[in-house]
Design a protein with these regions (language model features):
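Hydrophobic membrane-insertion alpha-helices, especially the h-region
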Residues: 7-16
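Low-complexity, acidic/polar, glycine-enriched regions of mature
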Residues: 16-223
Length: 223
């Protein structure tokens, strides 16, 4: 009789254990369900050739230089953006800029003046041999979806002139088919990054502290 009871008990335990293995623990089921509910993330590679990234520096000075601002184009940059096409998060942005690719584009300057500005931009302002890269990496994305686009604020760390600061970049983002489009603007205080003001043209020009950035960036979907 005892042998029969033991046999039945072992059978019940075996059946229960088998059911446990097939079904899994409640935590496992919850984790699998949560994973299935996560939005699919799509990656886009930034295409500098189709994008526009500008830096505007207002100036004060004397004589005919007064009131003529700098329009600096960022020529060489790359990076990757990731987001869900039907939800704001998860989302991220990583951007790398070759500092030596920045150059004056304003048509108010002669080519000789542009050469002077570009030389000081690389040698004095950005010190590109010492600090060849400018980078940004997001750690938080907030915002909402409205009228077919995302209005977002991208928080993250920017490294400029060897100094790391946390900034927030507002942007309007749309994704259509294979293409991502992001537009926006933000500003930085050059003094917080130990960036020198150039004194081109024998000291007649002085750049203000505030640098204004505008971007119209295109990314192509990574297959």
């Amino acid at each position: 009789m005892k042998l029969l009871i033991v046999t039945i008990s072992l059978s019940v335990i075996a059946i229960a254990f088998g059911s446990y293995l097939r079904i899994g623990t409640p935590k496992t089921v919850e984790a699998e369900t949560a994973a299935n509910l996560l939005p699919e993330t799509v990656k886009f590679r930034i295409d500098a050739s189709k994008s526009r990234f500008m830096v505007y520096a207002d100036r004060t000075g004397v004589l005919y230089f007064k009131g003529r601002s700098h329009q600096i184009a960022v020529r060489d940059f790359d990076g990757e953006a990731a987001l869900s096409l039907n939800a704001l998060n998860p989302a991220s942005l990583a951007l790398n800029i070759r500092a030596a690719s920045l150059e004056e584009t304003s048509d108010v300057y002669t080519q000789k003046e542009k050469d002077i500005i570009n030389g000081e931009l690389k040698g004095i302002v950005l010190e590109t041999e010492k600090y060849p890269a400018i980078s940004f990496k997001s750690d938080e994305v907030k915002g909402e979806f409205r009228n077919g686009h995302f209005d977002i604020k991208i928080g993250g760390d920017i490294i400029l002139h060897g100094v790391t600061r946390h900034i927030v970049i507002p942007a309007t983002v749309t994704a259509e088919g294979e293409t991502l489009h992001a537009k926006g603007e933000f500003s930085l205080d050059r003094k917080k990054f130990n960036v020198n003001a150039t004194n081109a043209f024998h000291g007649t020009v002085r750049i203000k502290h505030k640098l204004n950035f505008t971007f119209d960036i295109v990314g192509e979907r990574v297959q």
